[in-house]
A protein has these predicted regions:
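Short, surface-exposed helix-loop/turn micro-motifs enriched in polar/charged residues
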Residues: 7, 72, 89, 194-195
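A generic structural signal for alpha-helix starts
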Residues: 49-53, 177, 194
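Short, positively charged loop/turn segments that connect secondary-structure elements
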Residues: 188-196
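Unchanged
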Residues: 41, 48-74, 79-169, 187-188
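N-terminal strand-loop-strand
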Residues: 1-42, 55
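Short acidic, hydrophobic short linear motifs in intrinsically disordered regions
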Residues: 173-186
Length: 196
């Protein structure tokens, strides 16, 4: 069979990184240093190298862009996205990952490689919509590069859907906590927990 007749996409990985900080759920974004979307917020992401394992690629890209070292026990595949024209430069397929920073895993994030800066943003679902804030600034769909807003939404919905039977988001919490703290954590993804 002639494989040359088939087009070959570039493969990327995107990382949705969560942590628990001052009783809030946060996600780590970068500001892009280069075009396309220069100056926009983005997930830590990059191209998978030839013959590179996907988990290795996720950890490498996050380390290169943010200086954060992920624990491979706390990452999991979220979704594969191949929407046409998602990257204006070329045809790409991305594998997005959920990544959980343990509460006691204190690391200094520092921008490098394709990142101009790093930002821990508060994230929550409010009235059924994604709310993303960087200090006093509220972010909207067009503030994020590529389809990263949609990937964040998918991440929030995935975690919400698994709160009852597989709450991997607990990986970001301190080992000992109160029922109120767990309700607040779960309420970040599903507001009904805040009314209990």
């Amino acid at each position: 069979e002639e494989l040359d007749k088939y087009a070959k996409p570039s493969v990327t990985v995107d990382s949705v990184i969560f942590r628990y900080f001052e009783e809030r759920v946060q996600t780590l974004l970068i500001k892009r240093k280069n075009h396309p979307y220069m100056g926009k917020y983005a997930l830590s992401s990059g191209f998978v190298q030839e013959q590179e394992d996907l988990n290795t690629a996720v950890c490498r890209e996050v380390r290169e862009e943010t200086s954060v070292q992920l624990n491979t026990d706390h990452i999991e595949q979220l979704v594969t996205v191949g929407t046409p024209y998602r990257d204006p430069r070329m045809w790409t397929i991305t594998i997005a990952y959920l990544c959980f920073m343990a509460f006691n895993d204190i690391q200094m994030d520092k921008a490098a490689d394709d990142a101009a800066s790093t930002h821990w943003l508060d994230i929550a679902m409010v009235n059924g919509k994604l709310q993303l804030t960087d200090g006093d600034k509220t972010l909207y769909h067009d503030d994020l590069a590529f389809d990263h807003w949609e990937i964040l939404l998918i991440a929030m919905e995935r975690i919400k859907g698994r709160l009852e039977y597989c709450p991997t988001i607990l990986n970001i919490m301190p080992e000992e906590n109160t029922l109120t703290a767990y309700h607040q954590l779960f309420g970040t993804f599903n507001e009904t927990y805040l009314k209990m």
